[in-house]
């Protein structure tokens, strides 16, 4: 990577950026002003600056400073908590808000004979200045700093103009940046699709060349990224891009292209896309979205096939579902660390599908007390779009819910059920 020795930033005032400072959270303001009053520099950085320039409401605010982690903790005391294995960060709590604070970093001193430079780069804690820190960041649009007192955007790498041109560009050589941290592959796709940006110096060939690196990512980091990809209103377009680039199987191995020849998986792909579209609509309307529901949809076809396979090996039908669900979830968490709070909901949604498929009035009345009734029913309605034999049964349940509503037994508004 070519790093300028003495980079000169562009200082862009409000006439250029038009940032609405009232959108900056109280917590971020508190952290920055406290650091400055203690004699340190502090700026907003990264995605929050990008979103403010685009006139979007940031999901969270990150602060960067020349104070080292131990100094940050000393300043904020019990309000702070150190985090991070790859690089030491500090979370500062102010009321109900948590602000992530990092220290300026620099590139490690590279020795020509150091063959493990890239590996060292992933875990270093070498502190630096703002002009060095900028070259540790992934994309130009995420390498913008904002001074809340001067109200200026500090731009070392042309990120502001990439934003105005609707471009996403790696800082330095894309392959090297992806090799340093393969998560940047997924982030590039997420930013390009959600912000409607075109790739500037990143080609489809780079994704194909680097896709295998995704296997090196920790399962915990992948779950965190999955939440961002699927719960922020652009899940369908992100998913379609991952499928088109043949990268989706690095997240969900069951969606490997070889499996797509199986009719069960083909139907499943259509169901997944419908579920993601509905999730996006809910997010845009300010309604809740459930990652457990989406994971249950994505892994459903694998569960059905696993159940079929186990029936050839196990005679006790009562054991088959639990074993199959455990096998599918255990295999998936090797790639994405789905936490138990999520996987338990998935199991519950799956388990009541048998009641929806073969309802009796007695079982249906019992199901009215089940906390996963609405999620399970919506899942069942989704399935009916690609599993035609379920259509009549969906009608049965709709009539049942009408009666339950009249008797004040329906535990949720009928408007919260899917009508596809």
Regions found by a protein language model. Name each.
Residues 1-420:
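Catalytic cores of the polymerase beta-like nucleotidyltransferase superfamily
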């Amino acid at each position: 990577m070519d790093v300028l020795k003495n980079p000169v930033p562009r200082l862009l005032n409000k006439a250029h950026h038009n940032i609405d400072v009232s959108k900056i959270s109280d917590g971020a303001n508190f952290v920055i002003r406290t650091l400055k009053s203690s004699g340190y520099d502090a700026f907003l950085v990264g995605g929050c600056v990008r979103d403010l320039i685009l006139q979007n409401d940031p999901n969270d605010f990150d602060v960067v400073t020349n104070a080292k982690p131990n100094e940050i903790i000393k300043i904020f005391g019990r309000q702070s908590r150190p985090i991070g294995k790859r690089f030491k960060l500090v979370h500062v709590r102010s009321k109900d808000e948590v602000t992530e604070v990092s220290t300026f970093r620099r590139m490690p001193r590279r020795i020509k004979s150091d063959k493990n430079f890239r590996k060292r780069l992933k875990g270093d804690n070498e502190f630096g200045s703002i002009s060095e820190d900028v070259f540790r960041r992934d994309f130009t649009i995420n390498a913008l700093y904002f001074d809340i007192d001067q109200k200026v955007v500090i731009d070392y790498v042309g990120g502001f103009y990439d934003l105005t041109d609707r471009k996403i560009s790696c800082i330095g050589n894309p392959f090297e940046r992806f090799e340093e941290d393969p998560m940047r592959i997924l982030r590039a796709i997420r930013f390009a699709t959600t912000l409607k940006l075109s790739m500037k110096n990143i080609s489809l060939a780079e994704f194909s060349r680097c896709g295998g690196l995704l296997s090196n990512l920790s399962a915990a980091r992948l779950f965190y990224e999955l939440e961002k990809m699927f719960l922020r209103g652009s899940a369908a377009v992100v998913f379609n891009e991952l499928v088109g680039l043949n990268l989706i199987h690095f997240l969900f191995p069951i969606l490997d292209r070889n499996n797509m020849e199986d009719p069960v998986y083909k139907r499943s792909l259509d169901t997944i896309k419908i579920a993601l579209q509905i999730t996006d609509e809910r997010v845009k309307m300010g309604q809740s979205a459930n990652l457990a529901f989406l994971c249950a949809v994505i892994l459903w076809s694998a569960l059905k096939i696993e159940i079929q396979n186990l029936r050839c090996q196990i005679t006790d039908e009562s054991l088959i579902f639990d074993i199959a669900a455990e096998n599918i979830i255990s295999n998936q968490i090797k790639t994405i660390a789905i936490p138990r709070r999520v996987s338990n909901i998935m199991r519950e949604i799956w388990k009541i599908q048998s009641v929806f498929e073969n309802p009796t009035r007695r079982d249906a009345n019992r199901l009215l007390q089940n906390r996963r009734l609405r999620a399970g029913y919506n899942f069942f309605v989704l399935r009916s779009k690609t599993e035609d034999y379920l259509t009549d049964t969906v009608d049965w349940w709709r009539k049942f819910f009408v009666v339950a509503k009249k008797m004040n037994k329906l535990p949720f508004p009928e408007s919260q059920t899917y009508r596809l």
